[in-house]
Amino acid sequence: MVSQLLFPLFPPFPALTGPAPSSTIETIKLPKNTGGHSPPSVLQRSLPRENKRIVVKIGTSTLAHPSGLLNIRRVEELCRVLSDLKNAGHEIILVSSGAIGMGAGKLALPHRPEDTPTTQAAAAVGQCELMYTYDKAFAEYNHTVAQILLTAADVDHPDRFQNFHNTMRRLLDLKALPIINENDTVATEEMGIGDNDTLAAVVAVSMEADLLILLSDIDGLYTADPHTHPEATLIAEIPALTREIWELAGGSGSSLGTGGMSTKLQAADICTQAGCDMVIANGSSPSVLYDIADGKPVGSRFRGKKG
């Protein structure tokens, strides 16, 4: 049954597996909240390689103006920087939110839709605009993009997830730049992955990425919510996700998106358990990706478990 393939959000303090086994494969069990009807999904990731493959996730609030319409200048800069990183030898995978927000803006909706039919209609309109913009922008630098839309069932079903993995590997072999989003046109709240922070972490682990970068409208993880506590300070290095770190997660995200700091910490938990580093950084200037790729201290870096 479809209800047994759900991929809901994690509890506030995810109980993932303990220390990695001594073999060359790390196994991560993603906890479910399905009432015990189905076993947790399992992802496998080889031990870390050289720092080459990078997954970049950009959120709706970073892609769009407050009106919901696409921030064309920012998208063009993002595509220029990612193209340059590819030219430098990095393998880039982009997880892009924005379909619903873009569609809401193009349809002149007064706010992000709340009912399912309007949400899915906005996603259908917005995904077209989003991919058209990406395709045109990356073509300026002679890079070919590929669209991949996923649902929770694709992630949970072993055969479908293996097909996704095989396709992704072939796309990277062909030097294409995969652009991934949740398939919001068919996904519902009950059947969806929930947010692209989680999706990006699943992609990063399954594709054996060396680094996941979450570009947001905030500089990183703070000692308190900087929107309401101006005295809050940025935490540059997080070696472990302690209970104190989890308690720093504030409320939900912006009015345009679905992800807040709690979803970013959940993404960090998935990545770090698998040995993959993750960085939260402000995406208002995509050129910050250069410094992050070079290992410079930008935003908040969560260190992956090694060994």
Give the positions of each predicted feature.
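C-terminal catalytic "cap/lid" subdomain
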Residues: F7, I25-N33, S38-T144, I148-G307
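Aromatic (phenylalanine/tyrosine) cluster motif
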Residues: F7-F13
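Short intrinsically disordered, low-complexity coil segments enriched in acidic
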Residues: M1-V2, T188
